[in-house]
Amino acid sequence: MAGFVYSPYNAYQGYGGNFGQNPHRPQAFPKNKQAAWKSNKSSEPPDYLDHFQRAQLKAILSQVNPNLTPRLRKVNTKEMGVQVNPRVDTGVQCSLGPRTLRRPPPPPSSPVKPTDCARFSRPVAVYSPVVDRRLFSLPQGGRLPKKSLPAPDSQSQPLKDRGPSPEEKEPETKEALEKSPVPGAEEPNEEEPNKPAFQFLEQKYGYFHCKDCKTRWESAYVWCISGSNKVYFKQLCRKCQKGFNPYRVEVIQCQVCAKTRCSCPQKKRHIDLKRPHRQELCGRCKNKKLSCDNTYSYKYIV
């Protein structure tokens, strides 16, 4: 009778249940079995009773006592763990062993059109108001078509009676400034309209001579237009504040024969042709930033 009441095998292995054990046998403490998903070596299913053995046990217990039924157990559940690690491929480890989740293949899409590659639904940059570059793409010809200006309306006619607007006055003032002569400025040649609007300045040796207060000294470095002796920066005399542009630049040549290289026995003033700025009255340029060796220097004026 005990063989029918108590099942000869443990119906609940792995959970440590006391049901189904022979009371005459000494009770042994069940060992905590490691979960199946932790052991990577075994890929066999757990040792649970299948549905056939459970139905057979239920039939035997119903003959002894209809109230005796096997204890409910986890039949359709399995222990599993999900490995989430950004450095390792995402995998699901269950009783059947580790299995890597694979992404489903993307659905077949239509071939990409050339217009789809140039879509910009957002602004091109933070500082750029352009939302779509296709709006500003040039046609195949390479130039944008010129739009014809709209014809003047009849409403613009009464505006002329009020007088010239400030925008119309600006070109008139510009024309007046261009016509008025500027001291020291060279008039551009009409033959060379594409001449750049800049000049090179050359530093030359000159002298300061005011005809009003009769002030004169030598060894004056003057900024002149390159290739000429015209003084670029013109100002009043520092002493009397009357004489305009007292700076002069003398030609570097002999004052007797008017040659750059000469062999005259006597000269009006001693001029070293190799270093023409070094004259008898010169001497203040020594050991200074603008020394005799750095006579000529160029400056770019825009």
Swiss-Prot record:
GO terms of molecular function: mRNA 3'-UTR binding; zinc ion binding
Record organism: Xenopus laevis
GO biological process, one term: oocyte maturation
Keywords: Cytoplasm, Developmental protein, Differentiation, Metal-binding, Oogenesis, RNA-binding, Zinc, Zinc-finger
Region feature (Disordered): 15-46, 88-117, 138-195
InterPro entries recorded: Zar1, ZAR1/RTP1-5-like_Znf-3CxxC
Function text: mRNA-binding protein required for maternal mRNA storage, translation and degradation during oocyte maturation. Probably promotes formation of some phase-separated membraneless compartment that stores maternal mRNAs in oocytes: acts by undergoing liquid-liquid phase separation upon binding to maternal mRNAs. Binds to the 3'-UTR of maternal mRNAs, inhibiting their translation.
The keyword Zinc is annotated on this UniProt entry: yes
Keyword 4Fe-4S: no
GO cellular component: cytoplasm; cytoplasmic ribonucleoprotein granule
Zn-finger region bounds: 3CxxC-type: 203-288
Annotated compartments: Cytoplasm, Cytoplasmic ribonucleoprotein granule
Tissue: Oocyte-specific.
Name of the protein: Zygote arrest protein 2.S
Biased composition (Basic and acidic residues): 159-178
Major location (coarse): cytoplasm
Entry domain remark: Disordered regions undergo liquid-liquid phase separation (LLPS) for the formation of membraneless compartments that store maternal mRNAs in oocytes.
Domain of life: Eukaryota
Record family assignment: Belongs to the ZAR1 family.
